[in-house]
Amino acid sequence: MCCYVGKATKIFLCLAAALIVVGLVLGFGLAHRTWGERKVQPDCRWPDCQLQPAYGGGGGGGDPLPATSGAGDTPPGVPLTEPAVAAFPGVASASSAAPPTASMPYLGPPSPFAVGLAPAHG
């Protein structure tokens, strides 16, 4: 004998089954990506890979930036006479900005806000 299942119950069961299927597909897809055999291994893992010595460290390593052919044949270009400064349009540079005036008083850090939230004893 079969019992009666209402329309709302059937809709709920279909939605629940669809959510379960979507969750399983996404879960196994994520697991396959993270635990799969084709996972890319990093070239170097800590602690096997140590930081390279600084330039001129005398570590016996080769030159990190090999010279290109003919690098010593041409003289270097004209050096910069002024340092590069990032300036935004409409904003004055820091050297031309006026020092702060007394019209804006210094306000120290705010005081801690303490409220008695402990239960009352009494």
UniProtKB/Swiss-Prot annotation:
Residues 1-35 form the signal peptide. Keywords: Signal. Residues 55-83 are annotated as: Disordered. This is Uncharacterized protein Os04g0629400. It comes from Oryza sativa subsp. japonica (Rice).
